[in-house]
Regions:
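Short, well-structured N-terminal submotif of metal-dependent ribonuclease cores
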Residues: 1-39, 54-66, 137-138
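Short glycine/serine/threonine/alanine-rich loop segments
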Residues: 35, 96, 112
Length: 138
């Protein structure tokens, strides 16, 4: 089980993304194995906005979120007060963006690795959690 950052989801939906193939293959492998993938509910608007922005097609952003919601092995975690406080602490201590801190906080709370392509998030979160990229994980 892994927490999946929006960068991985977005790369899987944007064919021109340099990480598209690795992201697609990793996610497909998780679905095939029936492995649970976890993201905060915040991932949905992040995915929709980034996909629509990068493709200049708003319908693709919505379609991407619908595809995520249809995955049989997805667990979307609400952003409650406990996770928000943890993310606020992480954002302050590690100097990461608020949304990035939510993913890091969720991985920390669940004691599972974070899967991301975001280099800054990766470097700053490593003292707190295991952070990996799809190209180094089965």
């Amino acid at each position: 089980m892994h927490v999946i950052d929006a960068s991985v989801w977005v790369a899987s939906f944007v064919e021109s993304d340099v990480y598209h193939r690795a992201s697609m293959e990793w996610l497909a492998g998780q679905v095939d194995r029936g492995a649970t993938v976890v993201s905060p509910i915040l991932a949905l608007p992040e995915i929709a906005g980034a996909v629509a922005r990068r493709t200049s097609q708003k319908s693709l952003g919505i379609r991407a979120t619908e595809m995520v919601l249809r995955l049989p092995n997805i667990r979307l975690v609400p952003l409650d007060l406990r996770l928000s406080r943890l993310a606020a602490d992480i954002a302050s201590r590690l100097r990461v963006r608020g949304a990035d801190a939510v993913y890091v906080g969720l991985a920390k709370a669940l004691n599972i690795p974070l899967l991301t392509w975001d280099r800054e998030q990766m470097e700053r979160a490593r003292p707190e959690i295991d952070v990996i990229t799809p190209d180094v994980v089965p």
